[in-house]
Amino acid sequence: MQPDFLILGCLLCIVLVLQILALLRRSDHTALDHVLREEHRVGRAELREQLETLERQQEVRLASFARSLTDLVARIDQRLDQLTASLGEDARKGRQEASEGQQRFADALGQRLTELTQRNAQSINEMRTTLEQQLHVLRADNAQQLEQIRTIVDEKLQTTLNTRLDSSFKLVSERLEQVQRGLGEMQQLATGVGDLKRVLTHVKSRGTWGEVQLDNILDQTLTQEQYARGVRVCPDASEIVDFAVRLPGRGQYEAPVWLPIDVKCPKEDYERLLDAQEQADQELVRTMGVQLERAIKIQAKSIRDKYIVPPHTTDFAVMFLPTEGLYAETIRRPGLADVLQREYRVVVAGPTTVTALLNSLQMGFRTLAIEQRSSEVWSLLGAVKSEFGKFAGILEKAEKQINTVGKSLGEAGRKTRTIERRLRGVESLSQEQTQVLLDGLDVDTAESDVDSDASF
């Protein structure tokens, strides 16, 4: 290919030289210019033809080279495929051989382990059988000897302990029953105290009116024996109070003292005060407040004059106001509560406060009952303490006897083992001789039992 390029270059140089000469002589040699132009055209045509020929040759050579390259790539791919298949087959054979070798090794190892396991299990079973037989024989001998000793000891201890423990437990049971009855009564009192606490923290009856509301509160708080309805507090008078709480007298047989509780509800005066407060009329509010105070004082004076009659009643009474709002307004009035307590000896109470007051009285009743029964419980506990002291002494004696028997059993076991060691080489007797010796031992045992009973 290089000579062709050299020829083509030379031709191009000649054409350029001719063109330069033609340009230099254009003005004087027109004919020559025409000739040169024709030759130049012919030269370009020849040059184009040569270039096309050269291009075709190059294409033919390139096509041949491409076919050769394609054939070479195909042969290389075929060779690589053959090589890959050969390597894969070799690897598969290697893996198969390795797997077969591992399997043979695992089978041999498993068989060896199985044989070792079977031999060990057989040896262990033989050892276990031998030990069980020896232990069974030893256990049977010990059990027989200990059973004989235990039978004798149990008979003695059972007779003595049953007699003494029965008498002691009978006496203690009687005392404990008395204590249990006393504690049961105290538990009932404690339950009542719990009910009292629940009522103090969760009062259900609120916001109702008059005597029905107070009756419900009394019924929820006190028992029927602790209060009464429509009580004539003074035998010489005809005034009857709505409700009265029965307080115990100073002595056991003295008449009860009544705590009067009267229901008062100046509803009209309170409603007029509420209307004035809604109208925001300060002067009217002040006037209605004064009227409410006057009505409360009139009711307190009426209670004092009618129902406070010492010694038949307490030296004060309770005015029950059925609504919390009326009670709060009464307490809120400056100095009104103090005047009622100091001048009229009347305590104002609403639904909540009267419940708290009644609960306090209920607590006092329960405390009084506990005080009355505490001396009985204390005496009973003293008797139980004395019996427990005796019972502790009996248990201590029984413990000493049981310890003595345990030591005797331990000593008998040690002597039994010593005798067994020494009798290993002794020849066994016949059945008749053995029975005769055992009968002799029974006689000796009976005599020792008689001696032991005498010692107990």
UniProtKB/Swiss-Prot annotation:
It holds the Pfam family RmuC. Keywords: Coiled coil, DNA recombination. The keyword Coiled coil applies. InterPro entries: DNA_recombination_RmuC. Residues 36-60, 106-158 form a coiled coil. Involved in DNA recombination. This is DNA recombination protein RmuC homolog. The gene is rmuC.
